């Protein structure tokens, strides 16, 4: 899980979701998991 100031989709399967006021990226590729921190 990458935690950074800016998150973006890396591939076509990445999905941007807002959870508890945070923007997270979930993907079938675990390397693409990100959270805005």
Curated annotation (Swiss-Prot):
Q: Name one GO molecular function term.
A: structural constituent of ribosome
Q: Check the record and name the SUPFAM superfamilies matching this protein.
A: Ribosomal protein L36
Q: Which residues form a coiled coil?
A: none
Pfam families reported in the protein's UniProt record? Ribosomal_L36 (PF00444)
User: Cellular component GO terms, alphabetically?
Assistant: chloroplast; ribonucleoprotein complex; ribosome
| Major site of localization recorded for this protein | plastid
**Where is it located?**
Plastid, Chloroplast
Instruction: Return the protein name.
Output: Large ribosomal subunit protein bL36c
Gene Ontology biological process terms in this record: translation
Q: Which NCBIfam families does the record associate with it?
A: rpmJ_bact
Question: What family classification does the UniProt entry report for this protein?
Answer: Belongs to the bacterial ribosomal protein bL36 family.
Record keywords:
Chloroplast, Plastid, Ribonucleoprotein, Ribosomal protein
Species of origin reads: Lotus japonicus (Lotus corniculatus var. japonicus)
């Amino acid at each position: 899980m990458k935690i950074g100031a800016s998150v973006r989709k890396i591939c076509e399967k990445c999905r941007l979701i807002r959870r508890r006021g945070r923007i997270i990226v979930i993907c079938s590729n675990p390397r693409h998991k990100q959270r805005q921190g």
